[in-house]
């Protein structure tokens, strides 16, 4: 949302100084990108009030038109037959777009949204759908292991657990789930070749 509002202000400034006119460049219609802005807003789990709510409301209208080939293809692959809503953004589309960065190819999410080649987009969307299935499996596997360790320290004010070779792409999600389960801050450290990587989640 912040980036979008910056672009709106920049667009207005360039219009006022007649930059588009002088460069003979068509002024971009930023409204067309509200589907992506609203998707990011929902997936960032920010409160849907004020400007955020307005952005998501208009973004859903843009998403309904399915102008973005990547989102359209992903919607079809996911079998969304109704008008996409906030649930679809946060729990169906968002996780698949993010899955590439968690267990597959980190560039897949961005490539899905900017590619206009139907064949390539379908391939990327299909792979993201598969990555998401792998992510779910890994998440549950790691969650089971970490929950056992977390239960040993559940009386501590902050739950800190560490283990070897827990998939770093899912420890953030697991930390969030354990934070909700125990209502305490959670820090998860995965160690691979003596190098530890951590993810932390805290309560409000």
Please name every model-derived segment.
Residues 12-204:
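Hydrophobic helix-and-loop "lid/oligomerization" segment in the mid-to-C-terminal part
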């Amino acid at each position: 949302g912040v980036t979008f509002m910056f672009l709106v202000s920049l667009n207005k400034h360039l219009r006022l100084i007649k930059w588009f006119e002088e460069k003979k460049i068509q002024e971009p219609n930023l409204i067309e990108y509200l589907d992506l802005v609203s998707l990011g807003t929902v997936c960032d789990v920010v409160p849907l009030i004020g400007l955020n709510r307005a952005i998501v409301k208009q973004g859903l209208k843009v998403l309904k038109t399915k102008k973005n080939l990547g989102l359209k293809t992903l919607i079809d692959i996911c079998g969304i037959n109704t008008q996409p809503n906030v649930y679809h953004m946060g729990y169906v589309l968002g996780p698949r777009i993010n899955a590439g960065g968690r267990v597959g190819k980190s560039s897949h999410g961005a490539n899905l949204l900017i590619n206009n080649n139907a064949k390539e987009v379908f391939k990327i969307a299909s792979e993201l759908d598969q990555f998401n299935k792998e992510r779910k499996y890994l998440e549950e596997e790691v969650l089971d292991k970490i929950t056992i360790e977390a239960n040993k320290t559940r009386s501590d004010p902050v739950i800190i657990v560490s283990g070897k070779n827990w998939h770093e792409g899912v420890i953030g999600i697991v930390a969030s789930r354990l934070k909700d389960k125990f209502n305490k801050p959670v820090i998860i450290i995965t160690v691979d070749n003596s190098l530890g990587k951590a993810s932390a989640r805290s309560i409000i």
